A protein has these predicted regions:
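Short S/T/G/P-rich N-terminal loop/turn motif that feeds into the first structured element of a domain
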Residues: 1-73, 83-93
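Short, exposed beta-strand-loop hairpins at the edges of beta-sheets
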Residues: 77-79
């Protein structure tokens, strides 16, 4: 497993829709294909325009598909809510 930091920029007013999907049964099922959900840590900026998640990823290809629109489950939601995202690999010093 790799520790990954994902930073996403959310379109204005779309945070509730984003979180609704992430907490839905459908969203959770897709996220389980990517990472160990028990190790996920998330936060959001006060204006709800940026989110940050530290995740323990076991399938990097699935992570990229989830974020870039090639996953058919996440694509409709992410097309509507995401402006951009960054993926960073974390290394322990």
């Amino acid at each position: 497993m790799k520790d990954i930091l994902v930073v996403g920029k959310i379109k204005e007013g779309q945070f509730p829709k984003f979180m609704g999907f992430m907490k839905s049964d459908e969203g959770i099922a897709e996220r389980r294909k990517i990472a160990d959900l028990s190790k996920t840590i998330g936060t959001v900026t006060p204006d709800q325009r940026k989110v940050m998640f530290k995740i323990a990823v076991h399938n990097m290809d699935a992570l990229h598909a989830f974020l870039n629109g090639s996953n058919p489950v996440s694509k409709p939601v992410f097309d509507a809510v995401m402006e951009s995202y960054e993926i960073h690999e974390l290394n322990q010093l």
